[in-house]
A protein has these predicted regions:
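Short, compositionally biased segments
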Residues: 254-270
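Alpha-helix N-cap/helix-start positions at coil->helix boundaries
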Residues: 19, 34, 49-53, 84-85, ...
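Alpha-solenoid HEAT/ARM repeat scaffold
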Residues: 22-23, 53, 57, 88-89, ...
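Intrinsically disordered, serine/threonine- and proline-rich low-complexity regions
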Residues: 1-66, 77, 82-85, 125
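Amphipathic alpha-helical scaffolding segments comprising HEAT/armadillo-like alpha-solenoid repeats
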Residues: 2-9, 32-44, 65-80, 99-112, ...
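Boundary/linker elements of alpha-helical solenoid repeat scaffolds
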Residues: 15-27, 53-63, 86-91, 127-138, ...
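Long, contiguous interaction/recruitment modules in multidomain scaffold/adaptor proteins
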Residues: 2-3, 114-115, 119-131
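Structural signature of alpha-helical solenoid repeat scaffolds
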Residues: 60, 95, 127-128, 171, ...
């Protein structure tokens, strides 16, 4: 007879750092009711830091293979955790959320968190909320505040990777400032900035960027080339088809670029 595993059993197991976290336990962290969440938060301070990250990584990975689970309750509860790595992973647990209140929280994290990791994850998820706003599925005021925060970061002297991610996230936005921001990034000598500009172009679904994308499809830098191939597919640039074919015939081409190019060419053909 199989013994029933209670959530208290799961928490007791979590506290024992010598034991591996069984896959069977991961579902029991899903969709916690208020009582279970309180139990979880009561024991959380006693869990060793490495063990905390191990659990959160397991939950994040499990989200990708099991569409029936949700760890939003845990994610929300840990957004204010004192450990920046925990906060970053908490945001990843909220990747499927479309709650407007979360967008406001992410905006605050982006502007005020003291650690880079949660700010990076906040930027990435804010991009999804900007898209919801463009689809009129997010209150206009919340979208505007999120866009303002992203623009502030892009124009700041903050971490370069964070600023580039903010540009990519804002690519979904129809704000008039986007044209200048994308152009400025595209004209930089830094390949990383040019690649981010191309990703923003693709997300904009604005054909004004078609020529810029086509001009970089055969760029020598793989970062730029990969982003250009992505953008060509997202913008549905039919003229890119012949260039992608040439790319696929190049035996020295990067494997990742070839794989993406093959997918995008099939997309353009249909």
């Amino acid at each position: 007879m199989t013994e029933t595993i209670t959530f208290q059993n799961v928490l007791d197991h979590l506290l024992d750092s010598k034991k591996e976290i069984p896959q069977a336990h991961l579902k029991l962290y899903s969709d916690l009711d208020p009582k279970s969440l309180r139990l979880f938060m009561d024991v959380w301070p006693s869990v060793k830091p490495v063990r905390k990250l191990l659990l959160l990584n397991e939950l994040i990975n499990h989200l990708e293979v099991d569409t029936l689970v949700t760890y939003e309750e845990i994610g929300r509860a840990l957004l204010d955790d004192p450990d920046g790595d925990v906060r970053a992973r908490a945001i990843l647990l909220l990747a499927e959320s479309d709650d407007p209140k979360l967008a406001a929280k992410l905006t605050n994290i982006l502007l005020n968190d003291t650690d880079l990791a949660p700010r990076m994850e906040a930027v990435n998820l804010l991009g999804e909320f900007i898209l919801l706003g463009e689809l009129e599925e997010l209150p206009e005021e919340i979208q505007r505040k999120a866009e303002d925060a992203l623009i502030t970061v892009i124009r700041s002297d903050d971490n370069s990777a964070l600023r580039r991610s903010a540009l990519e996230a804002l690519g979904y936005s129809s704000r008039p400032e986007m044209v200048t921001l994308i152009e400025s990034a595209f004209e930089r000598a830094d390949p990383a900035w040019k690649a981010s500009a191309l990703r923003a172009m693709g997300r904009s679904h604005d054909e004004r960027w078609n020529d810029g994308v086509i001009s970089t499809l055969l760029d020598e830098d793989p970062r730029i080339k990969f982003a250009a191939v992505e953008a060509a597919g997202e913008l549905n640039i039919q003229e890119a088809g012949s260039i992608l074919l040439k790319m696929l015939e190049d035996e020295e081409e990067d494997d990742d670029v070839i794989a993406l190019g093959r997918r995008q060419r099939c997309h353009l053909a249909h």
